């Protein structure tokens, strides 16, 4: 699946917190259509953070399906993610959706792709979308060389750096935070 992830989503785990943030830019081709979209939200009674990169309408469908899986599996993040990925691969209507999800709860952070992949990234760090490489490099540098920064500060700084480099990412951020077991 070829996704045009014209956004940046970052999730960071540090010092008992998990943070997920995203920029607010929606682009259509080379035109900015909206600058204050909310691409990160809370699901399952506020216990799960979810963000998307890719087609907005497709992402809302995936949020809905993922939340149904969370309800079905009593909030078990990994099980819900695996079941969504299986559905995404096998259901013809879902297989056409062009988006990726980043999801996190107090225990785990995962990336779910339309190829059926469920990946738990290293370092408790997710960075995806068009500015994901910039954000990941910035976040890793901050995590490795500045122990005083909070998870929120790392995520915000990484997103702002990505927004200053990537033309499909702005600096109008949505940030959500949970206490983490890890």
Swiss-Prot record:
It comes from the Bacteria. One of its GO terms (biological process) is proteolysis involved in protein catabolic process. The keyword Mitochondrion does not apply. The active site is at residue 7. Keywords: Allosteric enzyme, Cytoplasm, Hydrolase, Metal-binding, Protease, Sodium, Stress response, Threonine protease. GO terms for cellular component: HslUV protease complex; proteasome core complex. CDD domains: protease_HslV. Its EC number is 3.4.25.2. Belongs to the peptidase T1B family. HslV subfamily. Protease subunit of a proteasome-like degradation complex believed to be a general protein degrading machinery. This is ATP-dependent protease subunit HslV.
